Amino acid sequence: MRSSVRSALALAVSVAFLPVVTVVTHAHFKLLEPASWLLEDDRGDPQKAGPCGGSNTDWGKPSYAVTKAVGGSKLHLKVQETIYHPGHYRVALAVNSPAELPPDPKATTTDSDRGPRSVSAEIQNPVQVPVLADGLFVHSAKADAPFETDVTLPNIACKRCTLQVIQFMEQHAVNNPGMFTYHHCAVVEIAPDSKKPIDAAWPKER
């Protein structure tokens, strides 16, 4: 009997002094449509680095996927959030180089014991070139189903446009790289619609 009591006490003491493990949750998403330009794992990684994904240790492997579309038409967008975090999405388009993509959304932050923490971000309304849509899929609860919508493409000629889809995360600590944003891109070949005027606000393909 005494042996059993001593064993129980020893177990209780050992459990009491086990290290406390803090779980840090990071939001992640997969770009389902159009096809991502990188091969993504089940969580959508690598996706932290801007403007188009990768990380400090893994810049990703190309998928060589190219989505064909008609200028002035709608392109279907579908993303799956694999790890929940509140926030919203933005879509932008670069004609000649990913360098044409806009900076990540400017964040409002608050101080925490672990450094800056995101509160919100600027949302363009109305959007300006090269942003196609902003403030998409605003959510503050976990969603099991994919987020889907259509975005209207400019009527331009573009053999290898870069379509960028990013997620801004609220209530999130700073990531390195990427700060408060996760990034995915797709290569889109756009053929202009001859029945519509060319969108002069967009850069010409070089």
Regions found by a protein language model. Name each.
Residues 28-206:
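Structured recognition/catalytic domains enriched at protein termini
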Residues 2-11:
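Bacterial N-terminal signal peptides that target proteins for export
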Residues 20-27:
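Sec/Tat signal peptide C-region and signal peptidase I cleavage site
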Residues 10-20:
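Bacterial N-terminal signal peptides
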